[in-house]
């Protein structure tokens, strides 16, 4: 635990944009060799779940206490994935592989792939407080097959889709979260699948998400609705953005049943 505490203290005080183990150990007075920190993370005797479980319980307990103190019961649950880019020559970290880069692919004729790791994260926002509640590492099916070639049968990995990992985290939150909160779940179009949407609705949670344009609403593709509604007046909706300024949006309201969600 000594090296874990050293790393935690260094992470708190470090102002470096890119934090490496060697860089963190340079901040520590009379620090041991940085390889000790790497070995602690690589061959630690505890599992990720053993560390995550008490953190999740602490976060929910703190969130409930803050809700009672501030009388704020509207909880925003945001779900998103993040791509952490690595050097093109990085090969020996198990989770590193080439992933589709949504950001760099925008506006390009061909998809762009970046060497790195992908993780999914669930964040909670209640009033002025924000929590990094939980996260999961995502491995491509190709990556799982490659890693399993070098593993014993009892230690082999199982491929899981992003939507499956997302639901796993939301199910854990649902089990810990007491009644009384009005919950809004936010995610992008990648997670707008039947299973995840129905799970959220069964809990009485609201969902705010993007939908891919080829999905159907009231038996018509979303991409066709702007033309159909072109004669309908826009509604002006004002929202307070992060810098507390009001921003006006022009929207049209449409109700119907969504179909063709994979």
Stretches with model-predicted labels:
Residues 1-48:
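Gly/serine-rich nucleotide phosphate-binding loop at the start of the catalytic core
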Residues 27, 61, 65-66, 168-176:
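A generic secondary-structure signal
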Residues 149-262:
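An internal, acidic/charged active-site-proximal segment
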């Amino acid at each position: 635990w000594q090296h874990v505490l050293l790393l935690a203290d260094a992470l708190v005080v470090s102002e470096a944009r890119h934090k490496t183990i060697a860089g963190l150990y340079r901040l520590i007075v009379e620090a041991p060799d940085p390889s000790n920190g790497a070995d602690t993370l690589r061959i630690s005797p505890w599992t990720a779940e053993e560390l995550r479980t008490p953190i999740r319980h602490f976060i929910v307990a703190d969130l409930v206490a803050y809700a009672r103190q501030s009388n704020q019961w509207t909880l925003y649950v945001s779900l998103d994935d993040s791509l952490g880019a690595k050097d093109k020559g990085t090969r020996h970290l198990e989770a590193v592989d080439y992933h589709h880069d949504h950001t760099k692919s925008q506006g390009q004729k061909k998809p762009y792939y970046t060497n790195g790791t992908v993780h999914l994260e669930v964040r909670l926002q209640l009033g002025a407080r924000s929590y990094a509640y939980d996260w999961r590492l995502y491995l491509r099916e190709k990556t799982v097959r490659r890693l399993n070639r070098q593993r014993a049968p009892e230690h082999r990995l199982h491929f899981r889709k992003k939507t499956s990992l997302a639901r796993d985290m939301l199910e854990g939150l649902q089990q810990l979260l007491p009644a009384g909160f009005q919950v809004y779940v936010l995610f992008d179009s990648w997670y707008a699948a039947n299973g995840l949407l129905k799970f959220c609705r069964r809990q009485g949670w609201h969902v705010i998400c993007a939908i891919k344009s080829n999905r159907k609403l009231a038996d018509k593709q979303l991409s066709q609705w702007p033309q159909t509604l072109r004669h309908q007046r826009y509604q002006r909706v004002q929202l307070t953005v992060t810098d507390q300024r009001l921003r006006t949006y022009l929207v049209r309201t449409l109700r119907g049943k969504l179909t063709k969600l994979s």
